């Protein structure tokens, strides 16, 4: 007989207080059809590919570290559009609106030929090749070898109006007192990716300085560094979407060599030493006495990867990208008039070898070659050029819009001079004439407060573009590409004629006061 029972499942009720909804920038920002082109100079940097070079005292940096495996983080500073002397003042009403920039197009230009760079360590911790081993491996006190390899191939760029968020694994604080020699706990940390931070080259995104005390497990360029990787999951789920409008990446690698580490194993393979011998012969059977296998070898296996073929057929650079719809709520609006472009590209990773004759005399007078008479140097160069298409947009000064902007970044309202102005305590102030006179009181020692940079202390490649904007898009390569793809050109019998693109969305005509 069928019997009815009440539902035993939980009943979920909506929250008592409404959840604040974050609006997309497309919901409240009005776009005009005024476009600007901006580009940087040729940006060049030269340095040593593996480490900083200091003087003998270690007090002066003589040659900085410049590697193809580093992140390049460009901070493009744009002019304030609200201070522009616009020819058509009907573009916006300063009493009810503010102007902002929107990114519509981007092209990251890269110079220099394609090339593969190698990295390595003169004391690399590898015992032997474990892929094609013809004898059993035995350890000694020092099995390090001079080894080099090519890194994982990576091309990537991230565009946003705040710095890119990176992730790496670092040493964590133990819950209690930890015995010396035990593996420390590790945790995932989020930090901003700064200019010069190393990218992952095949050994993971960890703090090698804190987690590898032997200083021989990785190559020279990262042995004293922290390799970071963009935290795409965090940036894609950001409520405002300022750190990453869009990105492009291409990574590839394969395991080229297989080695094993030297040293004492920290985590022994479970065997007869566990418990009362209940794990005996579970993972291996010991070798006979007198055999090389009587002492078990290390199981710390690892590969050295290779980035494989570098080809011009798979390049992300030297080509335009158009932003129609960003992945987050911010559809390309450049708050605070700045733009962050984070780039990694090691497909142009050639390291120059420079040899210098260290003896007196000319090279033509050398009788016999002697390697001791020549000094070998290494240098790496990077070449960039960035072009952007900017669109002029209007932000209405409405209560709901200002409330969201204030919650997102209250300093924007201060820059727009919309902050709260308190009522003066005294309508008249005291002003002395002779401030340097001994008969007059000392002036106020507190200096005026300067604007605090929210990214003070972080290292970026600052590029000033306040005077590099142009309305003549057809005079630039990226501008002509934008006009063509946007349909702002029309073909006539006499040639190609550009339709006006400097117009704007005209506002309501103001009434004259009587």
From Swiss-Prot:
Protein origin, superkingdom: Viruses
Record bears the keyword ATP-binding: no
Disordered: annotated segments: 495-514
GO cellular component: host cell nucleus; T=7 icosahedral viral capsid
Keyword Disulfide bond: yes
InterPro entries in UniProt: Capsid_L1_Papillomavir, Capsid_L1_sf_Papillomavir, dsDNA_vir_gr_I_capsid
Signal sequence interval, chain numbering: none
Keywords: Capsid protein, Disulfide bond, Host nucleus, Host-virus interaction, Late protein, T=7 icosahedral capsid protein, Viral attachment to host cell, Viral penetration into host cytoplasm, Virion, Virus endocytosis by host, Virus entry into host cell
Oligomeric form and interacting partners: Self-assembles into homopentamers. The capsid has an icosahedral symmetry and consists of 72 capsomers, with each capsomer being a pentamer of L1. Interacts with the minor capsid protein L2; this interaction is necessary for viral genome encapsidation. Interacts with protein E2; this interaction enhances E2-dependent replication and transcription activation.
This protein's name: Major capsid protein L1
Organism: Human papillomavirus 47
Chain's gene name: L1
